[in-house]
Amino acid sequence: MPDTIPRRTTTPCAASVRLEGGDRLDVTFWLLPDPQRELGVTPLRLLLEEDRRFFPVGLADSSSGLLSRDALVTVEIDADGPGTEPAPAEGTALDLVTLHLVSGEEISGILRSTALEGYGRMSDVFNSFGRFVPIGLGTRLVFVATARVARVSF
């Protein structure tokens, strides 16, 4: 039977995910169009923050699967690829931070945040993030699950 369900055009976003327990998977997230955004697609950050427990993904063997948000530790994408967001022109602060995960692993990178009046402390910055905090690592952008962060040093 032919597929008669109309589907929206999506943009593939290649990612490497690390799951609780240490397994790594190369996957593809499918980003919906968003003409209101500069890059024309919904940023991966917004997809990860949506109120859903499972994410549909493409797998390396061309099959499909579902990833549990609760099992995600990190989601890593190309910093110049689809799924990223342009940096605001003004009011952006860059800080070198180290995230100490509950597993004992450390992730060091650049935290980009927008200064909000009255919210200048690092605790304010981290409390403003949702389920994931984006950290720049050279040419990569890593979304780290905030539930997996034990402490932050800067």
State where each predicted segment sits:
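Conserved RNA-binding domains used in RNP assembly and mRNA/RNA metabolism
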Residues: M1-F154
